[in-house]
């Protein structure tokens, strides 16, 4: 551990909560240098929806490397890229009757958000955007300006501008969309007409706040009526995490731009894309570029993941069942321990439980880790315990993790509160 304390920057965060050295991983399990095993209910913050070292994806990648397939090719054509584009079209876009062009950005989610914002401003000729309270979109300047969290924003060191923040659904009891519409139609409101609205349908780092279908439909209607582009940040909520491939599918809306990263690469390899309606593809060649636009190794595993998990409804059915199992445990804990918990948050397997304060959530997460499970928190006060296991988890493994969580809750309840029956 000394090497990390000596040489790695203080900016590290997850490792502070899990002070062990991991050596290998498979499925939903992590293993330390000493051979201790931990259930992974963090899954790379949603980057490992198909699990660690998924054997089918690993085999496809090994075969590609063995035949000396292209590793790095800037944005040149490659068989790997063609395979991914075909898989995305065949298994995701066509079945949902979605017509998007694909832009490969730098390999992180914030790269995709920056590109989406830049394109929206270019197309509309406007400099401002609208974002929402408790939203998180990345830590580079443009994405950070649209992020609500003070902890991340204050690390910038300079002003973060050209973003108007509107209350997300349920925030402080305010109808944010009514306010937004009023401000758009009031010349004295002080809000310049935005190029785009940027949102997460389920706010990951903001505390798993889930927008209703009706709210999303209202927002989409407002954007269309006012010639404003709608950008959905599906970096954490996409690729099945909320139960469908895109988080916005249940609402029936069709965003103008969608950003994807994290699990889009299938194997945990860096990859990010922007999906944009064809009429918005107004880039000039090389106008938005980068050395690592498109990871050919990730193309291989991404295409295989789409083929294996999204060619029929079996995977969605499995996610739905997992979500029901987790929901039952959360609902039971909320009923049994009202002095500890407020409510269930999120949807699908982007789900969690809101504690009465962040210290309690941290204590639960630590107790889980001490009992062999990695689990994290989210929210303004880190008050929400997030259940973010790989979506490929088996029922027995899921139940094992839920048992660890319930044991932690019961231990802490006995320590601090009079236990409910």
From Swiss-Prot:
This is Diaminobutyrate--2-oxoglutarate transaminase. The modification N6-(pyridoxal phosphate)lysine is found at residue 262. Keywords: Aminotransferase, Pyridoxal phosphate, Transferase. Pathway: Amine and polyamine biosynthesis; ectoine biosynthesis; L-ectoine from L-aspartate 4-semialdehyde: step 1/3. CDD domains: OAT_like. Its EC number is 2.6.1.76. Its cofactor is pyridoxal 5'-phosphate. It comes from the Bacteria. Belongs to the class-III pyridoxal-phosphate-dependent aminotransferase family. It comes from Vibrio parahaemolyticus serotype O3:K6 (strain RIMD 2210633). Pfam families: Aminotran_3. GO terms for biological process: ectoine biosynthetic process.
């Amino acid at each position: 551990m000394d090497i990390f304390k000596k040489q790695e920057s203080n900016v590290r965060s997850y490792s502070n909560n899990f002070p062990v050295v991991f050596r290998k991983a498979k499925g939903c399990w992590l293993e330390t240098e000493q051979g201790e095993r931990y259930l992974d209910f963090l899954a790379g913050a949603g980057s490992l929806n198909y699990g660690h070292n998924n054997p089918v994806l690993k085999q496809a990648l090994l075969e590609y490397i063995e035949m000396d397939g292209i590793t790095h090719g800037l944005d040149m054509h490659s068989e790997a890229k063609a395979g991914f584009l075909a898989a995305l079209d065949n298994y995701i876009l066509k079945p949902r009757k979605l017509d998007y062009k694909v832009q490969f950005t730098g390999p992180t989610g914030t790269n995709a958000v920056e590109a989406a914002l830049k394109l929206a401003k270019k197309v509309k000729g406007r400099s401002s955007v609208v974002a929402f309270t408790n939203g998180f979109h990345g830590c580079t300047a443009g994405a950070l300006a649209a992020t609500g969290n003070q902890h991340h924003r204050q690390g910038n060191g300079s002003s973060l501008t050209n973003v108007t923040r509107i209350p997300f659904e349920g925030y402080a009891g305010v109808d944010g969309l009514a306010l937004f519409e009023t401000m758009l139609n009031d010349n004295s409101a002080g809000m310049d007409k935005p190029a785009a609205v940027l949102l997460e349908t389920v706010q990951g780092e903001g505390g798993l706040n889930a927008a209703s279908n009706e709210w999303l439909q209202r927002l989409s209607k407002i954007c269309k009526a006012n010639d404003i582009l709608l950008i959905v940040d599906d970096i954490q909520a996409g690729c099945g995490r909320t139960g469908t491939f895109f988080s916005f599918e249940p609402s029936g809306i069709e965003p103008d731009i969608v950003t994807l990263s994290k699990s889009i690469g299938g194997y945990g390899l860096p990859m990010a894309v922007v999906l944009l309606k064809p009429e918005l593809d107004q880039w000039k060649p090389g106008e938005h570029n980068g050395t690592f636009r498109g990871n050919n190794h990730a193309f291989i595993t991404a295409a295989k993941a789409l083929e294996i998990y999204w060619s029929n409804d079996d995977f969605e059915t499995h996610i739905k069942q997992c979500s029901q199992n987790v929901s039952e445990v959360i609902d039971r804990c909320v009923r049994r321990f009202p002095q500890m918990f407020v409510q269930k948050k999120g949807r699908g397997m982007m789900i969690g439980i809101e504690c009465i304060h962040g210290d309690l959530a941290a204590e639960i997460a630590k107790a889980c880790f001490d009992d062999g499970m990695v689990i994290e928190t989210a929210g303004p006060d880190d008050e929400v315990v997030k259940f973010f296991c790989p979506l490929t988890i088996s029922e027995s493994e899921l139940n094992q993790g839920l048992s660890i969580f319930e044991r932690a809750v019961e231990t802490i309840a006995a320590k601090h509160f009079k236990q409910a029956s």
